[in-house]
């Protein structure tokens, strides 16, 4: 469709590389360890979602081929998978810079707050595994429009939150990253909406 072609064109035009963000502008040593662990925890919460997104959209990308979807749909789902891989990488780079360790679950906390935050993060990762099991079972059963109607509110919320975070952030590297992610999520929302508008009128509600 013309709408999805527009989304694909913007995805190509707006592609970004997390490694090219201005990481050198961030002085993590200016923060206390409690602050560093708290900020890293925020990125860890985000990574619970963003680390699950690449395989989620990769499974949907494969389904577009199985369902013989038109070319624009397939390319759009590829673009979402690629975007979400960037978001996961952004989370990992932020966590590594803040903690000096690449994995928040095996990191040795330096404060009591850090220990409590890590305990909660481990529980969230466990729940994330349960979500993946449920999603894998749902992919063969439902159409793309039904599957991704459940993602629509998340994409709307993400686009809004990241634009607000970019506007209020004082760290240039995070500000730029938030701006890119918010723009990506806006495109993902447009893809969900386009599929729903195309397919919902044809669905049997019985």
Give each language-model segment a name.
Residues 1-206:
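Non-heme di-metal
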């Amino acid at each position: 469709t013309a709408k999805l072609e527009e989304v694909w064109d913007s995805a190509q035009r707006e592609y970004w590389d997390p490694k090219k963000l201005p990481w050198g502008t961030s002085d993590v040593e200016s923060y206390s360890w409690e602050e560093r662990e708290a900020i890293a925890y925020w990125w860890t919460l985000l990574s619970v979602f963003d680390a699950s997104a690449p395989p989620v959209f990769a499974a949907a990308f494969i389904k577009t081929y199985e369902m013989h979807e038109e070319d624009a749909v397939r390319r759009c789902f590829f673009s979402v998978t690629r975007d979400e891989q960037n978001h996961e990488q952004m989370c990992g780079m932020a966590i590594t810079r803040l903690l000096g360790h690449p994995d928040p679950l095996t990191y040795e906390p330096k404060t009591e707050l850090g220990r409590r935050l890590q305990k909660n993060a481990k529980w969230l990762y466990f729940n994330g595994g349960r979500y993946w099991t449920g999603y894998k079972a749902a992919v063969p059963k439902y159409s793309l429009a039904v599957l991704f109607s459940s993602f629509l509110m998340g994409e709307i919320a993400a686009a809004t939150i990241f634009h607000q975070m970019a506007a209020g952030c004082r760290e240039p590297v995070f500000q730029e990253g938030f701006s890119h992610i918010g723009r990506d999520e806006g495109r993902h929302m447009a893809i969900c909406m386009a599929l729903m508008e195309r397919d919902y009128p044809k669905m049997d509600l019985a």
